[in-house]
Amino acid sequence: MKHLLTVIFCMIVYITQINARLTFQTFDVKSGISDNYVIAMLRDQYGFMWFATLNGLNRYDGYQCKQYWVTDSDTYSNCFNNISEDASGTIWVRTPDQYFYYNRELDKLESNIEKRLRPLGINDKIEMIHVDYEQNLWCMTGNKLYYYDFQDKKLQELSFPDKELSHIVSRQSYSCLLFSNGEIAEVDWETKTVRKIVQLELPRSGEHRIYMDTQFRLWIYTIYTSNLQCYDIQNRKMFEFSGKETIQSDIVKAIIDDGNGNIWIGTNSKGIYILNEQADNLMHIHRDSGTPFSLSSNHINSFYKDNQDILWVGTTKQGVAFTDLNNTAFEICKTPEQEDISCFQEDRNGKLWLGFDGKGLACYDSKQINYKLFNTHNSNIPSNLIIGSYLCLLYTSDAADDGE
């Protein structure tokens, strides 16, 4: 009994520490996005955040949101179900009816996806597009599968069984297909074959999804059902995980691996469960109106982890919640000039630029721990009085500098 109480106490302390460590901020319609029902998210190679919602696609530049629609009359067609970016920088989005790509030059969504696919050697009418973890492109048409490797600039294709394909997942050397009948097959591009590895029993109705974590385990779930199963590819067996009954007491909507040994499982109404492999236990994160910076909603739609270790949570009612997985509260950057900082901006390389009220412009590189000051004496900036910045544009003043 004493041992049991000790275990329970340790679990409570661990869960409390996790909840205390994670602080969430919220981005919603009040912040500028078109709808609080957020279905998918993306941070592109330029640092813009994209939010696919029930009513419109949104791009956030750090200051404001811009909305994109494909029609002015049909709300259904403006529901964006998915968004991804391949290694070439092409952003692909999907509505209930069709696929679009984002034309950066014209700043609009284009429906003629053939324009981007033909140069890759893909000429068929495409029914499904998938971008994998290495940002390579997968396309499906009929019972034919295309795979384009951007690094090798190589297109491969193969035929798969005449079955309804529900989802594609690929990470490093493992590529798997989930069919609507519950069959999971592995793709071998060397032999150009598709071989069955396991047969699962799935609900007859609903959208079947598959997710591959960093340990190459497949998490299979069906939207709007409590069904959740896990299959270990490397060991070729089903994986039993802690808290399965607790998780399946609600509808599973999204799954993600945070890269730190935790599997995040988003539910329809009970918030987020975090399965920690090392501690072999289940943690629960939920909305707490009495706690500052808690999760904004228990109704989870989607997850997305960007390259800055920010985890984004799409909800059905409260927009987007996001948290820093590294829990870096503050980092001190000393400024020897000891002058008022009038503005600051982060560039696409992660460097922080500081504008001073009379001492010029400084650049701080947190990765290299390097600090450099630019002024009228050692650079070509027109003034030491920096009054603002916006979208990489610098604003100065010709007024007399107080510090000079």
Protein language model regions, located:
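Carboxylate-rich, polar loop motifs that coordinate divalent cations or form catalytic acidic clusters
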Residues: 1-398, 404
